[in-house]
Amino acid sequence: MQFNCKFKNESCIYINLGLATQYENFYRFYLGLDSSNDSIQVKKLKEHLKNDQDQESRYQYWSDLEIGMGNYTVNFSNVKELKEAYYDLNDRMQEYMKIIDKKDLPASINSQKLIRDLSYPDQYLRPLFKEEIYNFLKKWGTSVYETYIVSFNYTNVLEKILKIKENDNMQLSNSRFGNSNTLYPIIHIHGKVDAPLIGLNDKNQIKNELLRENEEVQECIIKPKLNEMLAHLVDVKVDNHIRTANLICIFGHSLGDTDKLWWNLMGERLKTDCRIIYFAYNPKELLRPSELNNIRRKYKNLLLSKTSLTESEKKDASNKIYIALNTDMFKLT
């Protein structure tokens, strides 16, 4: 018998390390490039992105950019125009991520803290909820632990910190019950710096009705189709890991609709014997005692709103979600 723990992380750990992996960092890089030889479609896209930053509802996260690209498809008359703009954005993003991936990490990084955080994510919960998780974990008190990280980031930062090669396993700290805990190779569901994937969850997010059903368009900008064409089984592995997870930890993720496939899977998993710890971050959130339940409800409802669960199922699932707000999780310097 084994216990399966899954971590789904995006970019907060990289931001904590001072790495410029946010959309706004790429935005400045992309619009700062020489545009004199750009095609008409690329120039129009850059102008759109520039104007977007002046809007109150401007893109803040990578998922906002992805949804925005789906909306922007109404500006294309044919597949060729779409590919011109999309491929330039994707190629420049690849260039940018390669630059970030080559940067030296801070010498002060505490790799042992990363190992502890991966081993005991429940340490950041309040005592009552920590006890509830402990009692839940007792079911696997004699089991070996398997830990998987699904990274939505393109860089190899985690591998560098942990000093592991691409296909290496490593031993984390023993479980709270003294059994082994193995971290398996990190899975990059959106690809890595040599072939980053950026796009949509499904065809309904393509707002150009004339291009929506076009097979080439779908294969260009729908992430599940891109993973399917790559035939690397990464998507199959992530699907299987979520379906068998006993504990899922979400850290640093904007819960964007362009990854709705995975939120739906987690919603389905919550119908079973599984728990989720959602590490939310909002420095503007005041942790007044009288507001704690409101805050928990807000983040639980946000996560559940991304699933396809019925209202009755959401009510049941809510009791299986734990919110950890503004913690020191993965603060390594």
Regions found by a protein language model. Give the residues of each.
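Short, solvent-exposed loop/turn segments at secondary-structure junctions
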Residues: 154-157, 192-195, 254-256, 283-285
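A structural signal for short, well-ordered beta-strand segments and their strand-loop junctions
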Residues: 14, 41-44, 61, 78-81, ...
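Gly/serine-rich nucleotide phosphate-binding loop at the start of the catalytic core
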Residues: 1-145
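SIR2/sirtuin-family catalytic core signature
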Residues: 236-333
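Short mixed-charge
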Residues: 123, 127-128, 135, 166-182
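Short active-site loop/helix that positions an aromatic residue
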Residues: 156-165
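Short, well-ordered loop/turn elements at secondary-structure boundaries
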Residues: 142-146, 180-184, 242-245, 271-272
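Acidic, metal/cofactor-coordinating or nucleic-acid-engaging core segments within structured domains
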Residues: 197-243, 287, 291-304
